Amino acid sequence: MKIAVVVFPGSNCDVDLYEALHSVCHADVEYVSHRQKSLAGFDAVMLPGGFSYGDYLRAGAIARFTNIMPAIIKMANEGKPVFGTCNGFQILTEAGLLPGGLKRNDSQRFVCKTVPLEVVNSHTLFTSHYQDHERIALPIAHADGSYYADEKTLDELEANNQVVFRYATENPNGSLHNIAGITNKHGNVLGMMPHPERAVETILGSTDGLRLFESLLENGRIKVEA
């Protein structure tokens, strides 16, 4: 299984994501520039956190129009795994690969801390190594992390089990329904504001993010080999 980590101007978590996959999980992973137009040969793609294009207009709004995005959308439509954390999540919503959007935190401040999460759906490509309703702790670091969608969309997300992670004991940004991460209807696209790549080794304070990558690698290999 070969994974692409896309690098946009202003990405600053691409190295974290790459090292979590390469150094900790020993996965086959490569950096891919936003200028490229093809993801041929890759089985999954990941969009890192950061401040693509300085978050001008809206977080992720400009990155959505880069050369690489049609290839990412193509992979998503083919059912291949697509993952976005923080700014990556924002880009996925701007591209229409995930419903809703991310707006400024209710506090109007940048929030950087580790928060407790509930695993709401462990039956996805990305969460099979977790248990439903399990409590985990992952870091967040964002100013525009408040998830918003209209009531119809929220009802559909809940009915289709598309809410994967929820803020457990406190809502750090004002996200509706305490949503921290969602998938598309097919379950192959996941976006989340917390940073699992920052919680893959004990020295980092938590390994709760490691199982997300282990889930993806195990399920992705099964799909590729099939």
Swiss-Prot record:
UniProt xrefs under Gene3D superfamilies? 3.40.50.880
Q: Which organism is it from?
A: Limosilactobacillus reuteri (strain DSM 20016) (Lactobacillus reuteri)
Q: Reaction catalysed by this chain?
A: N(2)-formyl-N(1)-(5-phospho-beta-D-ribosyl)glycinamide + L-glutamine + ATP + H2O = 2-formamido-N(1)-(5-O-phospho-beta-D-ribosyl)acetamidine + L-glutamate + ADP + phosphate + H(+); L-glutamine + H2O = L-glutamate + NH4(+)
Check the record and name the InterPro entries matching this protein. Class_I_gatase-like (IPR029062), PRibForGlyAmidine_synth_PurQ (IPR010075)
Q: Where is the active site?
A: 86 (nucleophile), 195, 197
**Role:** Part of the phosphoribosylformylglycinamidine synthase complex involved in the purines biosynthetic pathway. Catalyzes the ATP-dependent conversion of formylglycinamide ribonucleotide (FGAR) and glutamine to yield formylglycinamidine ribonucleotide (FGAM) and glutamate. The FGAM synthase complex is composed of three subunits. PurQ produces an ammonia molecule by converting glutamine to glutamate. PurL transfers the ammonia molecule to FGAR to form FGAM in an ATP-dependent manner.
Instruction: Note the PANTHER family from the entry.
Output: PHOSPHORIBOSYLFORMYLGLYCINAMIDINE SYNTHASE SUBUNIT PURQ
Instruction: Tell me what this protein is called.
Output: Phosphoribosylformylglycinamidine synthase subunit PurQ
A GO cellular component term found in this entry reads: cytoplasm
What residue stretch is flagged as signal peptide? none
Q: Which gene encodes it?
A: purQ
Q: Which HAMAP family match?
A: PurQ
